[in-house]
Amino acid sequence: RTTAPSPVDLRKTVLELLASSEKPLTKNQIARELGVRGDERIALKQLLADLEEEGKLDRGHRRRITVADRPFAPGHVIVAEIIGVGEDAELIAIPLDWTQDAPVPKIELLPSRRSDPRHSALSIGAHVLIRLQSHTKNIWRGEIIKKLEKTAKVHLGIFTRNRDGSGRLSSCHRKDTFPGARLSPEESIDLQDGEIVSYSVSVTQGTKIQKRIGRIDNPKTFSQMAIYAHHLPHTFSEEAIALSEQGKIPELGKRTDLRHIPLVTIDGEDARDFDDAVWATPDEDPRNTGGWRILVAIADVSYYVRPGDALDQAAKDRGNSVYFPDRVVPMLPEALSNELCSLKPHVDRACMAIEMILTGDGKVKSHHVKRGLMRSQARLTYTQVQQAIEGNVDKITAPLLETVIKPLYGAFKSLLKARIHRGTLEIEQPERQIIFGEDGHIDRIIPRPRYDSHRLIEEFMIAANVAAAHTLDAKGWPCLYRIHDAPDALRVANLRLTLRKMKIPFSKATSPRPSQFNELLAATRNTPLAQMITDLVLRSQAQARYSPLNIGHFGLSLSQYAHFTSPIRRYSDLIVHRSLISALQLGNDGLGDKSVSLLSVADHISATERTAAIAEREVMDRFVTAYHVPHVGEDFTATIVGVTRVGLFVAIKDTGAQGFIPRGNLRGDTFYHEEESHRLVGRRTKTVYQLGSLLEVRLISADITANSLIFGVAEDDDTPNKRPVRRQENTSRKQMKKIKKPRRNR
């Protein structure tokens, strides 16, 4: 029996399963392999029918299903995206999934079909099912079978006014292939140069402005751009807000009273939602010498967010909170996330808690899940706790040092032993932190400090997450596992090949263990190659995701793992809480049905998590680009992190910013690319630009709109044969003389 890949989305998972199967499968076999039950079978049946109609699946003997192997040829059916209108008013489309090396072909949808109702109100960006008919050179003709999208795709654009009064909407992302749109003087009369808008383009209605977002020279616009570009839900319905404001602290009732335990929260200085609290004390059992009793208490969000209500639907749609440098797009309204579900000090709060008994080596001897009422003793920060354990106490940490903080560190050291024994993958990716000046401009960008206090909380959370997964397994209740597959053999082979060309040794194992990746990282940690090797290892790994089917967590070296500790900001944790409530009979507001399928939920929240990560990275990069605008013309120390035929990718040492040096900006010679050795070599001077090398670079352009930094190589003024690099005019530089700090909304 073939093991199906764990679902990231059902469509992709079905195709991967059938592609990996040695023989055709029936619909029932597919359902069993993917764990599809109940109403989910209806969705699976419809999906299989859609995939067959799209030409991606074939049915053979006894209606057994296989992946179709069809070339791009007349008579075949494909999914395409409409990208424009031709000179004769015909629609122009391109294949949606083009994986061939040849140029992407354009497809004309025949003008004779314009009267077809299937053409009415078709929007540029819409997906359609097309039957290919004929072609000349790289132009095909095709017939629309059906429309696959009901609504026009919304694009994000920056407005530029032309001399004749008309305007142009251009893409705000360098990877966006959409050609943009032209606006007449009448359509653009209210718009200003540099204004960001969301818009749709329809064949029948033309260009329609959906939302005026702000100007590119205003940093408040950066987060808004990501919100609209990635379609992040950011407002709550009146019903959801009303429900959040009706909530009250529950009576003790059947809950466990934990208010006498000195639990504390430990978070960043700028945190406003505190969803986890911790406590530890030495285990008094003489049979467990050196052991610990620890408690992890988590906000009881499930008490306020009931299955199917408006709050639940809003949280599910979002999947998770999204964190930008200047604001948070919360999963729940602030009345919950910053108030009733925030474990503020000295006030009663409903909680779900897991008590664990640890051995001196950090192994969990036993665990017990409770639904309780707690009262946090203090709101501490990572910096405070770290300074306290190092001997620098303040008025808050001084009375807690012996009774609370030192026991926490004692238990942490035990948990750390267990982590080391498991051989957890240790990838440290430095986070950047934007520091704003008093007048609101971006003062500097620094690596975010990382202390043992951060690791302490991480280890306590991991222990609680494991205990939650074990509990649901033991009780036979559904669980949304947090899974991480072992690296794909092809990715490992590519990593090994890259390292071999750089003469860096690595394990010859087909499936390396986390400890073998750690050896590679340790060997290069204090070298200029460190960040590049970390990135290579990270890219070789599978992506962690959610699934009701457990395959374990490779990176953490755990056989069972779930997310339990952040229900304020992750819907997965809320589902785990509900399942625990039902499994342990802790209330009537749990998951309810033991046979419920979590496949579609896993699919959805895995997707929202990926979208959030992309949006967060995009906004951070835009802030970093904006910071560099006043520094155009200055020199920086950089590391070469990528070598291509057309130039070098570099990372700035001080800010972590990444940019590009076009090959034409490499002065004094012409350079050719040695692909296997990852370097550019000068034909005359034999100057070498090698992957991982340090060099001084000069910032040539910082483009906030395209979110890109262009560099040249810095040279002394008396360098012979110096070819000057022309400093590119940058309108963003003029617009960004001072960057104001948007008001925080965390």
Predicted segment positions?
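A short macromolecule-binding patch
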Residues: D101-L110, D176-L183, G656-E674, P724-V725
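Electropositive polyanion-binding surfaces
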Residues: I189, V201, R215, M225-L232, ...
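Acidic, low-complexity intrinsically disordered tails
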Residues: R1-V8, P74, T670-L680, V713-R746
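Short, acidic/hydrophobic/Gly-rich beta-strand patch recurrent on exposed beta strands
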Residues: I92-D97, R168-H173, F649-D654, F660-G664, ...
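Charge-lined substrate channels and their catalytic hotspots, especially those that engage the 3′ end
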Residues: R1-L295, S302-V347, R379, Q384-Q387, ...
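Acidic/polar residues at beta-strand termini and the immediately following turn/coil
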Residues: G86, P95, S171, T359, ...
